[in-house]
Regions:
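Bacterial N-terminal signal peptides that target proteins for export
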Residues: 1-8
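Exposed acidic/polar residues on beta-strands and adjacent loops within beta-sheet cores, strongest
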Residues: 20-157
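N-terminal signal peptide c-region/cleavage motif recognized by signal peptidases
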Residues: 16-18
Length: 157
């Protein structure tokens, strides 16, 4: 009985440690999109490994939101695969096609710490990926790389 109890406690400690480790690399951030009267919530996939998985972009309308209730009116969302951890989410002016883009950056788990980024634009009822870059140096200008990717995409049409 003593051995059984010890094994059970060890297993519980392992599970608790593993659950805590999964939370150490979680990411959740709310980003205001005032010109659209929206707010976006970017979060990494729950219970996924730190180094790979997914993240979600959920968009809510704030057009009729009371103070403190800006995530009540869900509009749309997308899931995106990730290679690395989500590092940040912010808005950036990426030019005429994406004047208030939602940018999500990731950092690889490997020794290089390479950076990736995706840019999204929203409409009243949709969120759309407009540019994506991967394998950037850790100190790269993410906004410039996304602007360049947008330009290449435009010239390919």
């Amino acid at each position: 009985m003593k051995h059984c109890m010890r094994a059970l406690l060890s297993a519980a400690a392992f599970v608790a440690t593993h659950a805590q480790a999964a939370d150490d690399c979680s990411f959740a951030k709310k980003v205001d999109l005032p010109s659209r009267r929206q707010v976006a919530v970017v979060s990494s996939g729950a219970l996924e490994p730190c180094s790979t998985g997914s993240y979600a972009v959920r968009v809510y309308s704030t057009a009729h939101a009371a103070p403190g209730f800006d995530t009540d009116d869900y509009v749309t969302g997308v899931l995106h695969a990730r290679d690395g951890t989500v590092a940040d989410a912010f808005t950036a002016d990426l030019g005429a096609r994406a004047p208030q883009a939602l940018v999500v950056t990731t950092r690889s788990a490997g020794s290089g710490g390479y950076v990736g980024a995706q840019a999204y634009v929203t409409t009243p009822r949709a969120v759309r990926l407009v540019a994506s870059v991967d394998g950037l140096a850790p100190d790269a200008d993410v906004k410039a790389a996304l602007r360049q990717a947008l330009g290449k995409r435009r010239s390919a049409r």
